[in-house]
Amino acid sequence: MADLNAIVEQLSGLTIMEAAELVKQLEEKWGVSAAAAPVMVAAGGGAAAAAPVEEKTEFTVVLVDAGANKINVIKEVRAITGLGLKEAKDLVEGAPKEVKAGVAKAESEELKKKLEAAGAKVEVK
């Protein structure tokens, strides 16, 4: 049990970029994908009512392109994510990249506006 606690502590100290690299390496080693498996839904009879469509509550802000003013975009990415200079620079130069995931709609729109004001092209998914 102490070994598991030590692993948890080590993983908690990883940066976002390090965690993403860990996921890639584990996917390659185990031959799996971290993508969520599609859920199979049994088709009901003709009398069954259609399930109401749920509105998305969590969004992902994706940097599509840094544009001409990379320095301002890097500064904004650092402010949003809390990444160090090198990690933020790598994220911006490696576009398209996920900047922040699991954020509310209002926050995702605010982040999009900030990044676009800095000169970046951004998508909210």
From Swiss-Prot:
SUPFAM superfamilies: ClpS-like, Ribosomal protein L7/12, oligomerisation (N-terminal) domain. One of its GO terms (biological process) is translation. Keywords: Ribonucleoprotein, Ribosomal protein. It comes from the Bacteria. The keyword Ribonucleoprotein applies. GO terms for cellular component: cytoplasm; ribonucleoprotein complex; ribosome. The keyword Signal does not apply. InterPro entries: Ribosomal_bL12, Ribosomal_bL12_C, Ribosomal_bL12_C/ClpS-like, Ribosomal_bL12_oligo, Ribosomal_bL12_oligo_N_sf. GO terms for molecular function: mRNA binding; structural constituent of ribosome. Homodimer. Part of the ribosomal stalk of the 50S ribosomal subunit. Forms a multimeric L10(L12)X complex, where L10 forms an elongated spine to which 2 to 4 L12 dimers bind in a sequential fashion. Binds GTP-bound translation factors. Forms part of the ribosomal stalk which helps the ribosome interact with GTP-bound translation factors. Is thus essential for accurate translation. PANTHER family: 39S RIBOSOMAL PROTEIN L12, LARGE RIBOSOMAL SUBUNIT PROTEIN BL12M. Belongs to the bacterial ribosomal protein bL12 family. This is Large ribosomal subunit protein bL12.
